[in-house]
């Protein structure tokens, strides 16, 4: 029996629906990400995606569940002195995805994956800056953020890595702008990094898996065979891939995007004209179809 689960969407409008998986599942997302990763956007779609990205830089993305780092100061320079690539590590909270099978990694702790990667690329400690997640000083449901804070603090101090603490009012976007490589474990800061043309590595699964603007290292073997930061796609390809992903997350994955409109994170209005057969077909076929399947052209 096919079933549908639903949740509020990442960026606000529409309804997030999954077929035959719970709301944390990645199968439906990955399929749509991959399907549209190489497809051109129309000018309208590109403008809509660009406007959504701009909101994150301006701190006006109020329809997302949480807005972090608003009004924080930008450091005048990179926090360390290095002549090699500046590596920014931006761990996510992972409080929402803990123990879900689609988000599992082969390493016991996220810092174990980071150790493997930093060793594989021969990173020096002066290359690395770690930006602690703001909600590590908060409790989210049964997830106590301080455990992550304690883990990363000890890891940074043991390895001599510079870190920006959770409570510090330092702009994460400013750090991204000054880095050469951004390493994440599924966090949405990949959007800002992609919009700035940065080299992005995701250590493990994420909502943007299936896209090409980010390099995914999800196994020990993939880290061992990683060739470093030189063999990379161009900045233009990163820009294009980021725009395509954002549009997919904004208006393809959510269902009824034009008819369920967010006023705040918890209040929505429903407009007339939505076609209920879309929901019926999802139940019949067991597949999520893009709410907007239109694509642009090269001209």
Where are these regions (language model features)?
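P-loop NTPase catalytic cores that bind/hydrolyze ATP
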Residues: 1, 87-95, 269-270, 274
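Active-site and donor-binding regions of nucleotide-sugar-utilizing enzymes
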Residues: 1-39
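A donor-sugar binding/catalytic signature common to diverse glycosyltransferases
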Residues: 1-3, 7-9, 14, 167-215
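General small-molecule cofactor/ligand-binding pocket signal
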Residues: 4, 129, 162-164
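Short secondary-structure boundary/capping segments
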Residues: 13, 18-24, 102-106, 144-147, ...
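Leloir-type glycosyltransferase catalytic cores
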Residues: 25-74, 212-299
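Conserved catalytic-core segment of nucleotide-activated headgroup transferases in glycan assembly
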Residues: 56-152
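Donor nucleotide-activated moiety binding/catalytic core segment of transferases
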Residues: 81-82, 104-105, 141-191, 195
């Amino acid at each position: 029996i096919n079933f549908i689960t639903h949740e509020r969407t990442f960026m606000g409008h529409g309804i997030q629906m999954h077929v035959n998986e719970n709301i944390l599942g990645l199968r439906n997302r990955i399929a749509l990400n991959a399907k549209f990763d190489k497809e051109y956007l129309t000018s309208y779609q590109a403008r809509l995606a660009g406007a959504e990205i701009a909101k994150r830089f301006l701190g006006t993305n109020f329809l997302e569940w949480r807005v972090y780092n608003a009004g924080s100061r930008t450091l005048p320079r990179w926090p360390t002195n290095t002549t090699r690539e500046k590596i920014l590590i931006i761990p996510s909270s992972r409080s929402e995805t803990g123990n879900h099978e689609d988000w599992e990694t082969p390493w016991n702790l996220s810092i174990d994956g980071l150790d493997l990667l930093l060793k594989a690329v021969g990173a020096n400690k002066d290359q690395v800056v770690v930006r602690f997640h703001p909600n590590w000083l908060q409790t989210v449901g049964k997830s106590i953020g301080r455990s992550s804070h304690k883990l990363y603090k000890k890891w940074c101090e043991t390895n001599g890595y510079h870190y920006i603490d959770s409570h510090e009012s330092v702009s994460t976007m400013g750090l991204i702008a000054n880095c050469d490589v951004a390493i994440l474990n599924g966090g949405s800061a990949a959007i800002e990094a992609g919009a700035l043309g940065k080299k992005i590595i995701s250590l493990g699964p994420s909502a943007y898996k299936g896209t090409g603007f980010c390099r995914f290292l999800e196994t020990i073997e993939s880290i061992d065979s990683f060739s470093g930061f030189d063999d990379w796609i161009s900045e233009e390809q990163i820009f294009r891939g980021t725009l395509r992903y954002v549009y997919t997350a904004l208006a393809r994955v959510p269902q009824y995007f034009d008819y369920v409109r967010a006023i705040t994170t918890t209040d929505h209005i429903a407009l007339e004209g939505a076609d209920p057969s879309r929901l019926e077909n999802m139940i019949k076929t067991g597949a999520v179809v893009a709410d907007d399947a239109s694509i642009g052209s090269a001209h």
